[in-house]
């Protein structure tokens, strides 16, 4: 089904009698999930992590549910071969379109970012704006999650198709990115929102741009913070928290390792060593061809 440039299997050297030492798997379509990884470093410093970026098939936000399910199953099958103890879908589109389905198909816990983000948003405001990929917006996942908690909250959603490509192309400082952000935020500002949710894990990377365009009283919710808090609670409940020193984070991508490494250094503070995983026959996205 796939091949890797590294040896498959239990690279972390833990025994089956020590499940606490197994790594947490984290995946996203690209570098956006690094915002979740940074939170793991802060909140769960003893945990080892395997990070996967499906860069050959990004952006996910314009894909159908059937495509997303195929991609997610590919990744989870690979994660299972790496003997992870838990997986975090550091991708709102996957969380919206695939989480409930694949949770029933694997024997390790799988956490998504939407419910933790929705809970945090409801605690902060009553007029909530959500910026996300078009697929997440179309799914209404955030609105439904928020209304299940508090049906009296007003929710507005805006799909932002240009954000992920701009971030993956490292164009955050580009004036064009600011103008795109202004256009996406304007309808939410007109609705006098009091809270904004980053409905895509890429979007915290745009924080300086977005904050400069929002009224100062608008609170910003980063679901990455809250999904890792949920991970902490889940690990404690399952008795899977690691008390040993962590091993170095392992990075893998389906696209170009060098491109991911160059982008990742901006958010990690170090240059990650990245391996390539080839899911046989996957169609490489036009964006990935442009980045190559």
UniProtKB/Swiss-Prot annotation:
Q: Which SUPFAM superfamilies match?
A: Aspartate/glutamate racemase
InterPro entries cross-referenced by the UniProt entry: Asp/Glu/hydantoin_racemase, Asp/Glu_race, Asp/Glu_racemase_AS_1, Asp/Glu_racemase_AS_2, Glu_race
Tell whether Isomerase is among the UniProt keywords: yes
- Write the record's keywords in alphabetical order, separated by commas: Cell shape, Cell wall biogenesis/degradation, Isomerase, Peptidoglycan synthesis
All disulfide bonds of the chain are none
GO terms in the biological process aspect are: cell wall organization; peptidoglycan biosynthetic process; regulation of cell shape
Q: Which pathway does the protein contribute to?
A: Cell wall biogenesis; peptidoglycan biosynthesis
Q: Main EC class of this protein?
A: isomerase
EC number(s) from the headed UniProt entry = 5.1.1.3
Q: Where does substrate bind?
A: 28-29, 60-61, 92-93, 201-202
Give the annotated active site: 91 (proton donor/acceptor), 200 (proton donor/acceptor)
Please give the Pfam families that the UniProt record associates with this protein.
Asp_Glu_race
Q: Which reaction does it catalyse?
A: L-glutamate = D-glutamate
Q: What does this protein do?
A: Provides the (R)-glutamate required for cell wall biosynthesis.
Q: Which family is this protein grouped under? A: Belongs to the aspartate/glutamate racemases family.
Protein name (record): Glutamate racemase
The source organism is Trichormus variabilis (strain ATCC 29413 / PCC 7937) (Anabaena variabilis)
């Amino acid at each position: 089904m796939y091949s890797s440039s590294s040896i498959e299997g239990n690279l972390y050297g833990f025994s089956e009698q020590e499940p606490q030492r197994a790594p947490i798997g984290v995946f996203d379509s690209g570098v956006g999930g690094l915002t979740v990884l940074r939170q793991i470093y802060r909140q769960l410093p003893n945990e080892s992590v395997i990070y996967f970026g499906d860069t050959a098939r990004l952006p996910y936000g314009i894909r159908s549910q059937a495509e997303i399910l195929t991609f997610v199953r590919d990744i989870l099958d690979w994660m299972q071969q790496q003997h992870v103890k838990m997986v975090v879908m550091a991708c709102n589109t996957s969380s919206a379109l695939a989480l409930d389905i694949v949770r029933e198909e694997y024997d390790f816990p799988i956490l998504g970012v939407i419910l933790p983000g929705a809970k945090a948003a409801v605690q902060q405001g009553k007029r909530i704006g959500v910026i996300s990929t078009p697929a997440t917006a179309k799914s209404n996942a955030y609105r439904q999650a928020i209304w299940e908690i508090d049906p009296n909250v007003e929710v507005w959603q805006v799909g932002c198709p240009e954000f992920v490509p701009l971030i993956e192309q490292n164009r955050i400082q580009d004036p064009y990115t600011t103008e795109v952000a202004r256009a996406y935020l304007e309808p939410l500002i007109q609705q006098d929102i009091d809270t904004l949710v980053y409905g895509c894990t890429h979007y915290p990377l745009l924080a300086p741009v977005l904050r400069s365009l929002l009224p100062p009283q608008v609170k910003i919710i980063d679901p990455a913070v809250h999904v890792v808090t949920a991970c902490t609670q889940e690990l404690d409940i399952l008795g899977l928290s690691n008390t040993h020193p962590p091993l170095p984070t392992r990075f893998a991508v389906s696209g170009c390792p060098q491109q991911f490494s160059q982008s990742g250094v901006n958010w990690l503070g170090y240059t990650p060593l990245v391996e390539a995983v080839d899911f046989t026959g996957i169609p490489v996205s036009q964006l990935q061809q442009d980045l190559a």
